[in-house]
């Protein structure tokens, strides 16, 4: 697995994984190095960097091909050996200026539709190629019809009945322990003076009312 190089600390991390980078970036030495770097830039340079990032964000474009021109990588030569291109096939400096290419549809997502088109044709199936497997919902039926087809495994059950048999004994809860009735909670055992619970009376001490 390729190693990740931290420009601020001038070190290679053990692996290039999100958890390792997150742990490194929250470390005391890394934060001190970042703070020292930006403090050495001066107010005008830092403000110009902020303006570049803000204008790129507002225009909806990615960073310029060479980056924004800040960070330690622009002050010194890269380490020997170079780096492999980032995983996923994206260009090293981000997307080029201009409109970004659409991402290819993954499995389970419909292809790009023309602007203003409804997501699915009314009372019909989704367009061909929209889903790789069976449709998640059946086509729209007449108004007032149930959203799902009746279950074929039900033998004469009423509409809306569950598609599985109820458990033995129905849906009632567990039976109460022997010696208790099923009507409400059990009465308190030997209430204390004035109807107070014995634990509370004990906590309050003698004559604690």
UniProtKB/Swiss-Prot annotation:
GO CC annotation, single: U2-type prespliceosome
Zinc fingers classed as Matrin-type: ranges: 4-36
Gene3D superfamilies: Classic Zinc Finger
GO terms assigned for molecular function: mRNA binding; pre-mRNA 5'-splice site binding; U1 snRNA binding; zinc ion binding
Subcellular location: Nucleus
BP term (GO), one: spliceosomal snRNP assembly
Biased segments, Pro residues type: 93-150, 159-191
Segments of this protein annotated with the region Disordered: 72-209
InterPro entries named among the record's database cross-references: Matrin/U1-C_Znf_C2H2 (IPR000690), Matrin/U1-like-C_Znf_C2H2 (IPR003604), U1-CZ_Znf_C2H2 (IPR013085), U1_snRNP-C (IPR017340), Znf_C2H2_sf (IPR036236)
Low complexity bias locations: 72-87
Residue stretches in coiled coil: none
Broad class of the protein's primary localization: nucleus
Entry keywords, A to Z: Metal-binding, Nucleus, Ribonucleoprotein, RNA-binding, Zinc, Zinc-finger
Family per record: Belongs to the U1 small nuclear ribonucleoprotein C family.
Job of this protein: Component of the spliceosomal U1 snRNP, which is essential for recognition of the pre-mRNA 5' splice-site and the subsequent assembly of the spliceosome. U1-C is directly involved in initial 5' splice-site recognition for both constitutive and regulated alternative splicing. The interaction with the 5' splice-site seems to precede base-pairing between the pre-mRNA and the U1 snRNA. Stimulates commitment or early (E) complex formation by stabilizing the base pairing of the 5' end of the U1 snRNA and the 5' splice-site region.
Self-association state and partner proteins as the record states: U1 snRNP is composed of the 7 core Sm proteins B/B', D1, D2, D3, E, F and G that assemble in a heptameric protein ring on the Sm site of the small nuclear RNA to form the core snRNP, and at least 3 U1 snRNP-specific proteins U1-70K, U1-A and U1-C. U1-C interacts with U1 snRNA and the 5' splice-site region of the pre-mRNA.
Name of the molecule in the record: U1 small nuclear ribonucleoprotein C
């Amino acid at each position: 697995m390729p190693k990740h190089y931290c420009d601020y600390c001038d070190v290679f991390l053990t692996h290039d994984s999100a958890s390792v980078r997150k742990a490194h970036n929250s470390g005391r030495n890394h934060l001190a190095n970042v703070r020292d770097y930006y403090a050495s830039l001066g107010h005008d340079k830092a403000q110009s960097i902020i303006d570049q990032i803000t204008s790129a964000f507002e225009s909806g474009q990615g960073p310029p091909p060479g980056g924004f021109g800040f960070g330690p990588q622009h002050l010194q030569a890269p380490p020997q050996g170079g780096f492999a291109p980032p995983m996923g096939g994206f260009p090293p400096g981000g997307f080029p200026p201009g409109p970004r290419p659409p991402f290819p549809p993954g499995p389970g997502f419909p292809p790009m539709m023309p602007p203003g088109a409804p997501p699915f044709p009314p009372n019909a199936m989704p367009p061909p190629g929209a889903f790789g497997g069976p449709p998640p919902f059946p086509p729209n039926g007449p108004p007032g019809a149930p959203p799902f087809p009746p279950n074929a495994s039900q033998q004469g059950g009423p509409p809306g009945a569950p598609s599985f048999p109820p458990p033995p004994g129905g849906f009632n809860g567990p039976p109460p322990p022997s010696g208790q009735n099923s009507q409400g909670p059990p009465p308190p055992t030997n209430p204390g003076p004035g109807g107070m619970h014995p634990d509370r009376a004990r906590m309050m001490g003698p004559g604690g009312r």
